[in-house]
């Protein structure tokens, strides 16, 4: 009975409302004299229902209801004051709840125009009806934010001054001026209105309303501050406020509220004052007035006092934003932003950044612009476009010309000219008649795969030298060599290396074997001597004698050192024979194979007779210390390096522990920014001493024991200048790429002289990208020499309090592509060292030098089975710096020299791989190392892969850039991966000849089945691929194209799909097959479009880690990168089997691959260039990369905190119209 009663009541209420609205509509139509009373009565009844029944509100604003039209029509036509008041009250009730939807309905029905006209009519009355004005402004304030054109409408109707005059005339009538101020705030969002109101004295008026702390009228104070903040965004109004001294007044008001609001009840008012200061400091005059009023110190002190209260974070963040904005722009402390190293180009480009740099007058200051801080441009509107194009314009980058998208195979060079590349394909003409080939597959060459320990190779004099003999054919090693056969028999399989535990278990066996293989090595003590001079590896009789008999100790003024006898063999150190010192002089760092004792420990060691032996663990089977030194001697660098970095000498093995993605501590960014601001406030605390400087040859290492020593004068090193800021804090400046004035990202340097238990802060202050994975859990890498000597030679992720943010160092327009007002960014991290006086190396990512590549290739060549593997290393060309660019050919030897086997050998499809076109993307080399080692392994699947394909591999397309520590360019100062369309043989020889190889294959009708260029990605996680597709590119545009133009073989998706199922680090959801205009000159697009390779890819490996799969939540290491290289090979084998239906049954999951549509096409329009929105979750602490955020909500963390999950895009939608996959 109760339910029935409620239902009856509801129906009656609904019918009652409809009846009243019908009566009101009839009154509007009749317009009979005397109907005013009826309208007054009906509207009063409706108002009562609306105030008492929520259901009535929903019914009147529901879709299909004409209630709003009827009420607005009545409001527009009636002249009865009470009816108008009733209707206004009804509308206020309707829009007071229900979010913004109801207000939007009112706007779409024309409510704004009616209200403004009513306001104009009411203003003509004298005096105006106060109640009417209150209701009108209250309603306008509620619907105004939903009407984007309300500012223009108000100005045209003349409503601006009506509201302003009401405030001026009723300053004591808080009930009236409160809604008027709310409307003025809405009006002020229009810049023209803000200027107009400013001319009429609105700024001065606001400062009459706001004032020091008071518990009275706090609502009015808050609204007045919000209105003032909006008005001051106008440069004209901001100047007016500065001229009248209001900046000092705002600071005084803020301090007063800060002191008295001890219970933090008025945080919004305090934030409102800060928003006004934030607006006025958008102009230079405002920033100057802020500094003159001691604003930096005031906000710094108040924000420090707010740190303890989490709810006051919006005040701290807004204060930080203002201080960063007002921090004086500093000049980067460099004489020029051009590289410290100079290389004269053989040909100067006709246009482009390099040409502009060469054409600059010698007296031009390229570090900072004279007008850097002179413009009054509103810095709030600055668009971040470093490195990538702004996302607002990314649609323009997608290629929409269907004719350009269609692959067009064209040689580009005469066939006669391309014949020069025939020499790089001897496998197509080799008859193998002189080889002892058996007709059956030989047994695996590795007979003792469980034996750990080092790999012994021929001496350096017997091994391959790229400079003297660039071409090596795999069959040159003869089976009759008994020493070589013995070496093969004891070599472990590449992919079957024993784990550390099994190595320990067989330590006795290892010792017995190694004592027969290795001479005594030089031992090292636990303590490292501070200031020990670097050891010169020169061919002197003294050195030869020491290294032949035992340990050598180098004396200096501070330390008394004596030779130490080795108590046992260092099992894992390669012999330092006399060949190490032949040829040019090469220096190691502060450690070599020497015994070193400090003065304090010397007496103890002598008296006790105890000697501590430090061992270097067994590293990669293709690493050899001696051979590395030999390779260094043939490497040519522009600075003519004579030192060798210890990580490259000792080698690296992955640490045995997992390295999770670092969880960012809350508030770390603002803490670092506060410390930066302290430099201005407490200038006397700043040391500001240069401790390392490539530009100043006379700048020697500091003598003080408490000062760190730095060095980067070794292969791939990059560190230009170091300035000590505080006792344990250093600013580091990176070197530009040679013949360039930017690309600051890669770093690799040495640090020594540290103490334990101290947190050292390092700030790399001239980074250029607007964001970094350092904000999302990535850590820099450190290599400890002491740890390496303690059998732990590993690069490990280190650092706490890591963040990446915009700093106060100006970036000149010359270095920013013509854009003025740009700033650099800072990577900051803190490290506490484990060992006193250690020598440590820091790097952006795992270093992999050109000399390391040469060593690895030579080791692979010397260790392979020539009867099983066809291996050839050639010199593709010579680089600008005089270094050889190696190209490697790998396949399986033919089963025999019979015609059928030779024919099968020659007709294997080609796979063309390349890597390291960008020197800073070292992870690409580690992936390539995994690929090479897998291809050269005795794994049965590797043998099957070799029998399936011929691999042409250019493992390092940019040797010069790698050697000289560049991040992106070669010695030409240009990004080589943007030169594939028209490479210059003089400036881009590696690209010119790599493209020539592919053009030659196209000319002889031997197109590679797959081309893949290995890269690294600094802005995204996981490993993924970029490919090329006409259909997917067009799907991302609004261009209508005939379906016949979009017909293409979807086989380009097969390999990425295979990798997503086989490689743990690979993520299909991050792959993209869109072709952009900005990428038309890259290898991927040119090889697809011009050469005609459908499966043309760029494989991107994260620098950070993974957020999916087996490695979710972990930072990526060399083990995972090498695994990816091996898994890529496995994917190629599966691809081959899929292309041969008789040989392999297709998995059902891959059969329908051609039916997949583009995922997330509505959101991602250019994913190869831009970071996806869902790539990273939001922080609990809002990350402010820029010092000039334009978001009014930037500090309101309480409203923004929430769990945010990245939307994993699924790759499984179907397209019924797509063609079936062509497996060929």
Swiss-Prot record:
Location of this chain's protein in the cell: Cytoplasm; Cytoplasm, Cytosol; Nucleus; Mitochondrion
GO cellular component, one term: cytoplasm
Active site: 1100
GO biological process, one term: olfactory bulb development
Region of interest (Disordered), ranges: 361-398, 1186-1224
Gene3D superfamilies recorded: 2.60.40.3120, Leucine-rich Repeat Variant, Zn peptidases
Cofactor list: Zn(2+)
E.C. numbers: 3.4.17.-, 3.4.17.24
Compositional bias (Polar residues): 1206-1224
Catalysed reactions listed for this entry: (L-glutamyl)(n+1)-gamma-L-glutamyl-L-glutamyl-[protein] + H2O = (L-glutamyl)(n)-gamma-L-glutamyl-L-glutamyl-[protein] + L-glutamate; C-terminal L-alpha-aminoacyl-L-glutamyl-L-glutamyl-[tubulin] + H2O = C-terminal L-alpha-aminoacyl-L-glutamyl-[tubulin] + L-glutamate
GO molecular function: metallocarboxypeptidase activity; tubulin binding; zinc ion binding
Enzyme class, UniProt record, top EC level: hydrolase
Function per UniProt: Metallocarboxypeptidase that mediates protein deglutamylation of tubulin and non-tubulin target proteins. Catalyzes the removal of polyglutamate side chains present on the gamma-carboxyl group of glutamate residues within the C-terminal tail of alpha- and beta-tubulin. Specifically cleaves tubulin long-side-chains, while it is not able to remove the branching point glutamate. Also catalyzes the removal of polyglutamate residues from the carboxy-terminus of alpha-tubulin as well as non-tubulin proteins.
Protein name (database record): Cytosolic carboxypeptidase 1
Organism: Gallus gallus (Chicken)
Origin organism lineage: Eukaryota, Metazoa, Chordata, Craniata, Vertebrata
Gene name for this UniProt entry: AGTPBP1
